[in-house]
């Protein structure tokens, strides 16, 4: 009985791996909402936006609300209330972005916009183009609020990498998943864990690359550097596979 159960578990494990490999091969070679390719592009944009706002807009993070909460606490603790309050509006903008992303999944909205993932990418691209036209005289708060909103819509709309939950514009959760996959791959010798580790490592490296590019381009081109991120999103939208059943994560 024990041997039979072991063989059954091995068979199920192999079947699960084959299903994963099939799905991974499908989403890697076609740019869909769950593909590694799109995940890489979105991670680059996520890193870029945080670097852009931090370098050019008064040291505020657009996508990392954890960072904003930490900075809020630090500055309030030092009695710098005015400095601390600047970190609050991006938090509310982030919440609003989540609400918009959820609203795009409503049947009444999908009838008008049948490909919500493309709608999200186009919305992001247009907003970032507009932000790039704003002169430096525009208050930093307005810029960071706008970018926080856009980033939130992206994060809430694209939440699956192949078949794993992930974050397209932050790195902490992805790093945890990569570490867990590393244990599964190296200690338990699980091939599926190895593939997961490779996928999430690519996402993490892409985020870092986006931050590097965002810093260098912002220092060189100033506020218009954000058009680089807009271009990435526009390219992603144009090549994204038009499949309304898989374009937007619904869970």
Q: Which sequence ranges carry the predicted segments?
A:
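Alpha-helical transmembrane segments of multi-pass membrane proteins
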Residues: 8-251
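N-terminal acidic, proline/glycine-rich, low-complexity intrinsically disordered segments
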Residues: 1-6
């Amino acid at each position: 009985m024990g041997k039979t159960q072991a063989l059954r578990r091995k068979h199920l494990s192999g079947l699960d791996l084959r299903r994963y490999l099939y799905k991974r091969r499908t989403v890697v070679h076609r740019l869909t909402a769950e593909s590694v390719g799109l995940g890489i592009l979105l991670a680059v944009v996520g890193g870029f936006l945080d670097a852009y706002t931090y370098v050019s807009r008064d040291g505020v993070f657009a996508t990392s609300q954890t960072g904003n909460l930490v900075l809020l606490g630090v500055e309030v603790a030092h009695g710098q209330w005015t400095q601390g309050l600047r970190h609050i509006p991006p938090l509310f903008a982030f919440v609003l972005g989540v609400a918009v992303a959820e609203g795009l999944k409503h049947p009444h909205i999908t009838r008008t916009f049948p490909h919500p993932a493309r709608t999200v990418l186009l919305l992001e691209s247009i907003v970032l183009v507009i932000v790039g036209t704003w002169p430096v005289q525009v208050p930093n708060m307005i810029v960071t609020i706008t970018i926080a909103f856009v980033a939130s819509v992206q994060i809430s709309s694209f939440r699956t990498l192949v078949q794993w939950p992930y974050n397209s514009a932050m790195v902490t959760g992805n790093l945890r998943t990569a570490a867990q996959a590393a244990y599964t791959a190296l200690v338990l010798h699980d091939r599926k864990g190895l593939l997961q580790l490779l996928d999430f490592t690519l996402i993490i490296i892409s985020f870092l690359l986006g931050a590097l590019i965002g810093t260098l381009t912002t220092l060189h081109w100033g506020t218009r550097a954000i058009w680089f991120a807009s271009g990435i999103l526009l390219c992603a939208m144009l090549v994204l596979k038009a499949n309304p059943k898989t374009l937007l994560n619904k869970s």
